[in-house]
């Protein structure tokens, strides 16, 4: 019995050991179990296949990943320009003498920022995209806002902006500060204007009443016809004590229109021109010789003298208005003729003096001028003596009044 048990164990071991060798043998005959399984598999494969046409097909689109762009929204994000503004303080530039290293440091700073913001593009392409996006309205407004934040401003303006943002009503504005000197000036009371000459008078102290502008005559203005007639009459009737000396020297002492001397333009040959000769002749006719002292045809020249003459001058007999007008007309006609003749002769003498060299021109003109002035004085003297006639005392009072009016001019 024990021998049979050993044979059974040995055969079982051999069968188990050689069980796997038949699978690898291509020439072995198939076992009945494996043949049945192969038949079932072949039947399944031979079933007609319709390629899924009869079945419903569900078409599902895959969701696309959003494409990242470097636009204005990305530049305004936290990784964009706000981050660049925060980290700008870390950039240190050395300045003069280190331009190349500073430029390299600046470019590397921007490159690191763009690599973090938009890593898909190169540095040059990212800069071009930033420039293109910078022309949009949103970035323009943001840039203006950043510039305004960098400007200095007062604390009151900042407080008002904070209140507006929070929606609180703004308190009353603080009064503007002012220097003490201006505070004193504004706090002082206004004084009433006063007049220097008339403090308590009835004049308008505030100058509110409109007044008529009074024309002021310039010193060189020409008097009107009435004043000229009055001055000519007084000049013809009066005599100057130093007229003869002035005429001998070739120049008049005083003008009938004032105390100013005539401005003459000097010439190389010291020969007076036509205008100077005319002026000298007109002044010469207004004077009489110093040997005879006659008073004014209107009296002694004082309104309150009562008809009494000065002791130094004897009052000549007065004449009426018609004789005075005739005398004035005749004197003016003679003066105009003398002036024209003198002008012609002076111009002819100037031409001859220029041709001869101007040696004796000055002496020649002075002698001729003295002759004309002497003739004019003699004519004035004889005319005044011939027309002089006695007159009543009532006419003297009228003459004195006329003389006072002339002094008023």
UniProtKB/Swiss-Prot annotation:
Biased composition (Polar residues): 31-40, 288-301
Subcellular location: Nucleus
InterPro entries the UniProt entry points to: Csm3, TIPIN/Csm3/Swi3
Residue ranges, compositional bias (Basic and acidic residues): 342-359
GO cellular component: replication fork protection complex
Listed GO MF terms: DNA binding
Name by which UniProt lists this protein: Chromosome segregation in meiosis protein 3
